[in-house]
Amino acid sequence: MFALVDCNNFFVSCERVFRPDLEGKAVVVLSNNDGCVVSRSNESKAMGIKMGTPFFKVRHMVDEGRLTAFSSNYSLYGDLSGRVMSILADAVPHIEIYSIDEAFLHLDGIDPENVQEFCRSLVARVRQWVGIPVSIGVAPTKTLAKIASHFAKTHKGYRGVCMMDTDAKRLKALELTPIDDVWGVGRRLAPKMESWGVRSALDFVQRPKEWVQSRLGVNGLRTWEELCGIPCVEEENAERRKSICTSRSFADMIEDERELELRVSDFAAMCAKKLRDEGSAAYDVTVFMYTNRFREDLSQYFPSVTIRLPVAANSTQEIVGAALRALNTIYKEGYQYKKAGVTVSNIVPQDQLQGVLFGYDQTLRKKQDRLSELMDSVNADSGKAMLRLAAQREGHYADGIRCEHRSSLYTTSLDEIMKVH
Protein backbone atom coordinates (compact mmCIF):
# COMPACT_ATOMS: atom_id res chain seq x y z
CA MET A 1 0.00 0.00 0.00
CA PHE A 2 1.02 3.60 -0.67
CA ALA A 3 0.17 6.73 1.28
CA LEU A 4 0.20 10.12 -0.41
CA VAL A 5 0.77 12.88 2.15
CA ASP A 6 -0.36 16.26 0.83
CA CYS A 7 0.10 19.53 2.74
CA ASN A 8 -3.17 21.47 2.60
CA ASN A 9 -2.93 24.84 0.79
CA PHE A 10 0.75 24.66 1.65
CA PHE A 11 2.04 28.21 1.08
CA VAL A 12 -0.98 29.69 2.87
CA SER A 13 -0.59 27.18 5.71
CA CYS A 14 3.07 28.21 6.12
CA GLU A 15 2.05 31.84 6.51
CA ARG A 16 -0.63 30.92 9.05
CA VAL A 17 1.89 29.09 11.25
CA PHE A 18 3.23 32.51 12.25
CA ARG A 19 -0.05 34.38 11.79
CA PRO A 20 -2.64 32.33 13.71
CA ASP A 21 -4.95 35.34 13.57
CA LEU A 22 -5.51 34.45 9.89
CA GLU A 23 -7.10 31.07 10.64
CA GLY A 24 -10.57 31.04 9.12
CA LYS A 25 -9.87 34.13 7.00
CA ALA A 26 -9.32 34.54 3.26
CA VAL A 27 -5.61 34.38 2.40
CA VAL A 28 -3.67 34.09 -0.87
CA VAL A 29 0.01 33.78 -1.73
CA LEU A 30 1.31 35.43 -4.88
CA SER A 31 3.84 34.35 -7.50
CA ASN A 32 7.17 36.06 -8.18
CA ASN A 33 6.81 39.80 -8.63
CA ASP A 34 3.39 39.57 -6.98
CA GLY A 35 2.01 38.61 -10.37
CA CYS A 36 -0.77 36.10 -9.74
CA VAL A 37 -2.34 33.84 -7.12
CA VAL A 38 -0.48 30.54 -6.58
CA SER A 39 -1.95 29.37 -3.25
CA ARG A 40 -5.38 29.94 -1.71
CA SER A 41 -7.03 29.28 1.61
CA ASN A 42 -10.38 27.52 1.54
CA GLU A 43 -12.00 30.85 2.39
CA SER A 44 -10.47 32.57 -0.65
CA LYS A 45 -11.57 29.65 -2.83
CA ALA A 46 -15.12 30.16 -1.56
CA MET A 47 -14.87 33.80 -2.66
CA GLY A 48 -14.35 32.59 -6.23
CA ILE A 49 -10.63 33.36 -6.48
CA LYS A 50 -9.04 30.97 -8.99
CA MET A 51 -5.47 29.72 -9.25
CA GLY A 52 -3.52 32.00 -11.56
CA THR A 53 -5.79 35.01 -11.02
CA PRO A 54 -3.73 38.19 -11.62
CA PHE A 55 -3.22 40.08 -8.38
CA PHE A 56 -4.51 43.33 -9.82
CA LYS A 57 -7.94 41.70 -10.19
CA VAL A 58 -8.21 40.96 -6.45
CA ARG A 59 -6.19 43.86 -5.03
CA HIS A 60 -9.41 45.72 -4.22
CA MET A 61 -10.35 42.88 -1.84
CA VAL A 62 -7.09 43.47 0.03
CA ASP A 63 -7.76 47.21 0.16
CA GLU A 64 -11.26 46.51 1.50
CA GLY A 65 -9.89 44.24 4.24
CA ARG A 66 -11.62 41.12 2.92
CA LEU A 67 -8.43 39.38 1.79
CA THR A 68 -4.84 39.07 3.02
CA ALA A 69 -2.14 38.63 0.37
CA PHE A 70 1.46 37.50 0.84
CA SER A 71 4.39 37.62 -1.56
CA SER A 72 6.08 34.25 -2.05
CA ASN A 73 8.53 33.47 0.75
CA TYR A 74 10.34 30.43 -0.63
CA SER A 75 12.95 30.35 2.12
CA LEU A 76 10.19 29.88 4.68
CA TYR A 77 8.27 27.35 2.59
CA GLY A 78 11.36 25.30 1.84
CA ASP A 79 12.38 25.19 5.49
CA LEU A 80 8.93 24.10 6.72
CA SER A 81 8.71 21.55 3.91
CA GLY A 82 11.99 20.05 5.07
CA ARG A 83 10.62 19.76 8.61
CA VAL A 84 7.47 18.00 7.40
CA MET A 85 9.46 15.58 5.23
CA SER A 86 11.83 14.84 8.12
CA ILE A 87 8.89 13.76 10.30
CA LEU A 88 7.55 11.53 7.52
CA ALA A 89 10.99 10.00 6.86
CA ASP A 90 11.33 9.08 10.53
CA ALA A 91 7.97 7.30 10.47
CA VAL A 92 8.45 4.90 7.53
CA PRO A 93 11.36 2.95 6.01
CA HIS A 94 10.99 4.53 2.56
CA ILE A 95 9.68 7.90 1.37
CA GLU A 96 9.52 9.48 -2.10
CA ILE A 97 9.39 13.28 -1.95
CA TYR A 98 7.26 14.18 -4.95
CA SER A 99 7.15 17.97 -4.57
CA ILE A 100 7.60 20.68 -1.95
CA ASP A 101 4.25 19.73 -0.39
CA GLU A 102 3.71 16.07 -1.34
CA ALA A 103 5.38 12.76 -0.53
CA PHE A 104 4.61 9.09 -1.13
CA LEU A 105 5.13 6.74 1.81
CA HIS A 106 5.70 3.02 1.34
CA LEU A 107 3.65 1.28 4.03
CA ASP A 108 5.35 -2.11 3.79
CA GLY A 109 5.72 -3.69 7.20
CA ILE A 110 2.81 -1.83 8.79
CA ASP A 111 -0.07 -4.03 9.94
CA PRO A 112 -2.98 -3.36 7.51
CA GLU A 113 -5.36 -3.16 10.46
CA ASN A 114 -3.30 -0.33 11.96
CA VAL A 115 -2.68 1.74 8.81
CA GLN A 116 -5.53 4.18 9.39
CA GLU A 117 -4.55 4.79 13.01
CA PHE A 118 -0.89 5.15 11.96
CA CYS A 119 -1.77 7.77 9.32
CA ARG A 120 -4.00 9.72 11.70
CA SER A 121 -1.13 9.85 14.17
CA LEU A 122 1.07 11.27 11.40
CA VAL A 123 -1.52 13.96 10.62
CA ALA A 124 -1.59 14.95 14.29
CA ARG A 125 2.21 14.84 14.66
CA VAL A 126 2.89 17.11 11.66
CA ARG A 127 0.22 19.53 12.83
CA GLN A 128 1.59 19.66 16.38
CA TRP A 129 5.31 19.72 15.58
CA VAL A 130 5.31 21.98 12.49
CA GLY A 131 1.85 23.56 12.42
CA ILE A 132 1.03 22.40 8.89
CA PRO A 133 -2.28 20.58 8.20
CA VAL A 134 -1.89 17.54 5.95
CA SER A 135 -4.22 15.05 4.28
CA ILE A 136 -3.33 11.42 3.57
CA GLY A 137 -4.73 9.08 0.94
CA VAL A 138 -3.99 5.36 1.24
CA ALA A 139 -4.42 2.97 -1.71
CA PRO A 140 -2.72 0.06 -3.51
CA THR A 141 -1.27 2.35 -6.24
CA LYS A 142 0.13 5.88 -6.35
CA THR A 143 -2.54 7.12 -8.77
CA LEU A 144 -5.30 5.84 -6.50
CA ALA A 145 -3.52 7.32 -3.47
CA LYS A 146 -3.62 10.70 -5.22
CA ILE A 147 -7.38 10.38 -5.63
CA ALA A 148 -7.79 9.24 -2.02
CA SER A 149 -5.79 12.22 -0.72
CA HIS A 150 -8.14 14.55 -2.60
CA PHE A 151 -11.13 13.04 -0.78
CA ALA A 152 -9.27 13.26 2.53
CA LYS A 153 -8.65 16.95 1.89
CA THR A 154 -12.14 17.91 0.73
CA HIS A 155 -14.36 15.84 3.06
CA LYS A 156 -14.04 16.53 6.80
CA GLY A 157 -15.61 13.18 7.68
CA TYR A 158 -12.36 11.42 6.80
CA ARG A 159 -10.55 13.34 9.57
CA GLY A 160 -7.54 13.79 7.29
CA VAL A 161 -7.15 10.16 6.16
CA CYS A 162 -8.99 8.42 3.31
CA MET A 163 -8.50 4.65 3.06
CA MET A 164 -9.13 3.12 -0.37
CA ASP A 165 -8.58 -0.42 0.84
CA THR A 166 -11.51 -2.26 -0.77
CA ASP A 167 -12.68 -2.64 -4.34
CA ALA A 168 -16.03 -1.10 -3.47
CA LYS A 169 -14.33 2.06 -2.16
CA ARG A 170 -12.12 2.20 -5.24
CA LEU A 171 -15.03 2.00 -7.69
CA LYS A 172 -17.06 4.61 -5.78
CA ALA A 173 -14.10 7.00 -5.73
CA LEU A 174 -13.51 6.51 -9.47
CA GLU A 175 -17.18 7.22 -10.15
CA LEU A 176 -16.90 10.55 -8.32
CA THR A 177 -13.58 11.59 -9.93
CA PRO A 178 -13.73 13.61 -13.19
CA ILE A 179 -11.31 12.32 -15.80
CA ASP A 180 -9.36 15.60 -15.87
CA ASP A 181 -8.57 15.18 -12.16
CA VAL A 182 -6.76 11.88 -12.73
CA TRP A 183 -2.98 11.99 -12.31
CA GLY A 184 -1.51 11.25 -15.73
CA VAL A 185 -4.47 12.61 -17.71
CA GLY A 186 -4.77 16.31 -16.97
CA ARG A 187 -6.62 19.06 -18.78
CA ARG A 188 -4.79 18.69 -22.08
CA LEU A 189 -5.87 15.10 -22.75
CA ALA A 190 -9.23 15.24 -20.95
CA PRO A 191 -11.22 16.95 -23.77
CA LYS A 192 -10.23 14.21 -26.21
CA MET A 193 -11.21 11.51 -23.72
CA GLU A 194 -14.52 13.22 -23.01
CA SER A 195 -15.23 13.22 -26.75
CA TRP A 196 -14.89 9.42 -26.56
CA GLY A 197 -17.47 9.31 -23.76
CA VAL A 198 -14.91 8.99 -20.96
CA ARG A 199 -16.00 11.58 -18.41
CA SER A 200 -15.06 9.94 -15.13
CA ALA A 201 -12.25 7.72 -13.91
CA LEU A 202 -14.78 4.89 -13.71
CA ASP A 203 -15.69 5.35 -17.39
CA PHE A 204 -11.98 4.98 -18.14
CA VAL A 205 -11.38 1.72 -16.26
CA GLN A 206 -14.51 0.20 -17.81
CA ARG A 207 -12.95 0.49 -21.28
CA PRO A 208 -11.14 -2.64 -22.55
CA LYS A 209 -7.38 -2.78 -22.19
CA GLU A 210 -6.94 -3.02 -25.98
CA TRP A 211 -9.07 0.10 -26.47
CA VAL A 212 -6.90 2.06 -24.02
CA GLN A 213 -3.59 0.95 -25.52
CA SER A 214 -4.64 1.65 -29.12
CA ARG A 215 -5.73 5.22 -28.33
CA LEU A 216 -3.46 6.30 -25.48
CA GLY A 217 -0.34 4.17 -25.84
CA VAL A 218 1.90 2.90 -23.07
CA ASN A 219 1.47 5.89 -20.75
CA GLY A 220 -2.31 5.76 -20.97
CA LEU A 221 -2.29 2.03 -20.33
CA ARG A 222 -0.09 2.55 -17.27
CA THR A 223 -2.62 5.04 -15.84
CA TRP A 224 -5.49 2.64 -16.62
CA GLU A 225 -3.74 -0.21 -14.80
CA GLU A 226 -2.98 2.02 -11.81
CA LEU A 227 -6.69 2.90 -11.57
CA CYS A 228 -7.45 -0.82 -11.71
CA GLY A 229 -5.25 -1.33 -8.66
CA ILE A 230 -2.12 -2.60 -10.43
CA PRO A 231 1.04 -0.66 -9.36
CA CYS A 232 2.88 0.60 -12.46
CA VAL A 233 4.36 3.99 -11.56
CA GLU A 234 8.01 3.51 -10.67
CA GLU A 235 9.91 5.75 -8.31
CA GLU A 236 10.75 9.08 -9.87
CA ASN A 237 14.41 9.64 -10.67
CA ALA A 238 14.88 13.03 -9.06
CA GLU A 239 18.60 13.07 -9.79
CA ARG A 240 18.29 13.87 -13.47
CA ARG A 241 15.48 15.80 -15.13
CA LYS A 242 14.43 15.97 -18.76
CA SER A 243 14.69 19.76 -18.74
CA ILE A 244 15.53 22.63 -16.41
CA CYS A 245 13.82 26.00 -16.69
CA THR A 246 14.46 29.34 -15.00
CA SER A 247 12.03 32.14 -15.76
CA ARG A 248 10.52 35.18 -14.11
CA SER A 249 7.85 37.78 -14.68
CA PHE A 250 9.28 41.28 -14.47
CA ALA A 251 8.10 43.83 -11.93
CA ASP A 252 7.99 46.37 -14.75
CA MET A 253 7.77 45.61 -18.46
CA ILE A 254 11.09 45.75 -20.31
CA GLU A 255 11.62 47.06 -23.83
CA ASP A 256 15.39 47.63 -23.87
CA GLU A 257 17.39 44.79 -25.45
CA ARG A 258 20.39 45.30 -23.16
CA GLU A 259 18.23 44.94 -20.06
CA LEU A 260 16.73 41.75 -21.48
CA GLU A 261 20.24 40.42 -22.12
CA LEU A 262 21.10 40.94 -18.45
CA ARG A 263 17.98 39.09 -17.30
CA VAL A 264 18.40 36.22 -19.75
CA SER A 265 22.07 35.89 -18.74
CA ASP A 266 20.98 35.51 -15.12
CA PHE A 267 18.45 32.82 -16.02
CA ALA A 268 20.96 30.93 -18.17
CA ALA A 269 23.61 31.06 -15.44
CA MET A 270 21.16 29.57 -12.96
CA CYS A 271 20.30 26.75 -15.38
CA ALA A 272 24.00 26.00 -15.85
CA LYS A 273 24.53 25.87 -12.08
CA LYS A 274 21.61 23.44 -11.69
CA LEU A 275 23.09 21.22 -14.40
CA ARG A 276 26.44 21.11 -12.61
CA ASP A 277 24.78 20.44 -9.26
CA GLU A 278 23.21 17.24 -10.59
CA GLY A 279 26.19 16.14 -12.71
CA SER A 280 24.45 16.75 -16.03
CA ALA A 281 24.98 18.64 -19.27
CA ALA A 282 22.55 19.82 -21.94
CA TYR A 283 22.58 19.96 -25.73
CA ASP A 284 19.66 22.38 -26.18
CA VAL A 285 19.22 25.93 -24.86
CA THR A 286 15.83 27.58 -25.38
CA VAL A 287 14.96 31.22 -24.76
CA PHE A 288 11.37 32.46 -24.63
CA MET A 289 9.75 35.84 -23.97
CA TYR A 290 6.19 37.01 -23.41
CA THR A 291 4.53 40.37 -23.64
CA ASN A 292 1.74 41.14 -21.17
CA ARG A 293 -1.34 39.20 -22.31
CA PHE A 294 -3.50 41.17 -19.89
CA ARG A 295 -2.65 44.45 -21.64
CA GLU A 296 -4.91 44.34 -24.66
CA ASP A 297 -3.86 47.90 -25.51
CA LEU A 298 -0.30 46.71 -26.24
CA SER A 299 1.09 44.72 -29.17
CA GLN A 300 1.51 41.03 -28.36
CA TYR A 301 4.52 38.82 -29.15
CA PHE A 302 5.40 35.38 -27.70
CA PRO A 303 8.64 34.21 -29.37
CA SER A 304 10.92 31.30 -28.53
CA VAL A 305 13.94 29.69 -30.17
CA THR A 306 16.23 26.75 -29.41
CA ILE A 307 19.99 26.64 -29.96
CA ARG A 308 21.58 23.19 -30.37
CA LEU A 309 25.12 22.95 -28.96
CA PRO A 310 27.68 20.76 -30.79
CA VAL A 311 28.62 19.14 -27.47
CA ALA A 312 26.45 18.98 -24.35
CA ALA A 313 27.58 21.66 -21.89
CA ASN A 314 27.06 22.86 -18.35
CA SER A 315 29.58 25.70 -18.10
CA THR A 316 28.13 29.11 -17.37
CA GLN A 317 29.97 30.66 -20.32
CA GLU A 318 28.61 28.23 -22.90
CA ILE A 319 25.03 28.21 -21.64
CA VAL A 320 24.90 32.00 -21.29
CA GLY A 321 26.52 32.46 -24.71
CA ALA A 322 23.96 30.21 -26.38
CA ALA A 323 21.11 31.97 -24.58
CA LEU A 324 22.29 35.39 -25.75
CA ARG A 325 22.55 34.15 -29.34
CA ALA A 326 19.01 32.85 -29.06
CA LEU A 327 17.76 36.13 -27.63
CA ASN A 328 19.39 38.04 -30.47
CA THR A 329 17.40 36.06 -33.04
CA ILE A 330 13.96 36.67 -31.50
CA TYR A 331 14.20 40.14 -29.97
CA LYS A 332 12.10 42.77 -31.73
CA GLU A 333 11.95 46.47 -30.96
CA GLY A 334 8.64 48.08 -30.13
CA TYR A 335 7.38 45.40 -27.74
CA GLN A 336 7.18 45.58 -23.97
CA TYR A 337 8.16 42.24 -22.46
CA LYS A 338 6.63 41.05 -19.19
CA LYS A 339 8.35 37.67 -18.83
CA ALA A 340 11.39 35.80 -20.12
CA GLY A 341 13.03 32.49 -19.41
CA VAL A 342 15.68 29.94 -20.34
CA THR A 343 15.19 26.18 -20.62
CA VAL A 344 18.00 23.66 -21.03
CA SER A 345 16.96 20.26 -22.36
CA ASN A 346 18.20 17.11 -24.08
CA ILE A 347 20.06 16.46 -20.83
CA VAL A 348 22.70 13.74 -20.49
CA PRO A 349 25.01 12.61 -17.66
CA GLN A 350 28.16 14.70 -17.59
CA ASP A 351 30.38 11.61 -17.55
CA GLN A 352 28.79 10.28 -20.75
CA LEU A 353 29.45 13.25 -23.03
CA GLN A 354 30.00 12.49 -26.69
CA GLY A 355 32.58 14.87 -28.14
CA VAL A 356 33.19 15.78 -31.76
CA LEU A 357 36.42 15.06 -33.62
CA PHE A 358 36.78 18.32 -35.48
CA GLY A 359 35.81 21.93 -35.02
CA TYR A 360 35.64 21.93 -31.23
CA ASP A 361 38.31 23.36 -28.94
CA GLN A 362 38.76 20.83 -26.12
CA THR A 363 41.30 23.08 -24.39
CA LEU A 364 38.76 25.92 -24.24
CA ARG A 365 36.15 23.53 -22.84
CA LYS A 366 38.50 22.52 -20.00
CA LYS A 367 39.23 26.17 -19.17
CA GLN A 368 35.52 26.98 -19.09
CA ASP A 369 34.82 23.99 -16.85
CA ARG A 370 37.57 25.02 -14.42
CA LEU A 371 36.27 28.58 -14.32
CA SER A 372 32.73 27.38 -13.58
CA GLU A 373 34.06 25.19 -10.76
CA LEU A 374 35.92 28.18 -9.32
CA MET A 375 32.81 30.37 -9.51
CA ASP A 376 30.74 27.71 -7.74
CA SER A 377 33.33 27.34 -4.99
CA VAL A 378 33.72 31.07 -4.31
CA ASN A 379 29.99 31.74 -4.46
CA ALA A 380 29.24 28.83 -2.13
CA ASP A 381 31.73 30.15 0.43
CA SER A 382 30.41 33.72 0.21
CA GLY A 383 26.74 32.72 0.20
CA LYS A 384 25.96 34.94 -2.77
CA ALA A 385 26.84 35.49 -6.43
CA MET A 386 30.15 37.23 -5.75
CA LEU A 387 31.65 35.90 -9.01
CA ARG A 388 29.56 36.23 -12.16
CA LEU A 389 29.96 36.90 -15.86
CA ALA A 390 30.09 40.47 -17.10
CA ALA A 391 26.92 39.70 -19.07
CA GLN A 392 25.00 39.23 -15.80
CA ARG A 393 23.45 41.85 -13.58
CA GLU A 394 25.25 43.14 -10.51
CA GLY A 395 23.97 42.17 -7.09
CA HIS A 396 21.69 39.37 -6.00
CA TYR A 397 19.53 37.60 -8.52
CA ALA A 398 16.43 38.53 -6.54
CA ASP A 399 17.16 42.26 -6.86
CA GLY A 400 14.38 43.95 -8.77
CA ILE A 401 11.78 41.27 -8.00
CA ARG A 402 8.66 42.82 -6.52
CA CYS A 403 7.70 41.31 -3.14
CA GLU A 404 5.79 44.06 -1.38
CA HIS A 405 3.86 41.64 0.83
CA ARG A 406 6.58 39.19 1.93
CA SER A 407 6.42 37.86 5.46
CA SER A 408 9.53 37.59 7.62
CA LEU A 409 12.15 34.85 7.28
CA TYR A 410 11.02 33.49 10.62
CA THR A 411 13.05 30.26 10.53
CA THR A 412 16.05 31.06 8.34
CA SER A 413 17.28 34.52 9.40
CA LEU A 414 18.29 35.56 12.91
CA ASP A 415 17.58 39.16 11.94
CA GLU A 416 13.94 38.31 11.20
CA ILE A 417 13.23 35.71 13.88
CA MET A 418 9.94 36.23 15.69
CA LYS A 419 10.33 38.23 18.90
CA VAL A 420 8.32 37.45 22.03
CA HIS A 421 7.77 40.37 24.41
Regions found by a protein language model. Name each.
Residues 1-225, 233-235, 362-421:
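Gly/Gly-Pro- and Ser/Thr-rich, intrinsically disordered tail segments characteristic of DNA damage-repair
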Residues 10, 33-36, 292-295, 347-351:
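Short, charged/polar surface micro-motifs in flexible loops or helix N-caps
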Residues 23-25, 132, 281-283, 303-305, ...:
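A generic structural signal for short beta-strands and their flanking turns/coil linkers
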Residues 98-102, 139-142, 280-284, 335-339:
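Short Gly/Ser/Thr- and Asp/Glu-enriched loop/turn motifs at secondary-structure junctions
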Residues 104-109, 304-310, 354-359:
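Short, hydrophobic beta-strand segments
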Residues 146-148, 297-299, 353-355:
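Short, well-ordered secondary-structure micro-motifs
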Residues 181, 191-336:
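DNA-contacting surface of Y-family translesion DNA polymerases
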Residues 324-381:
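C-terminal hydrophobic structural anchor segments
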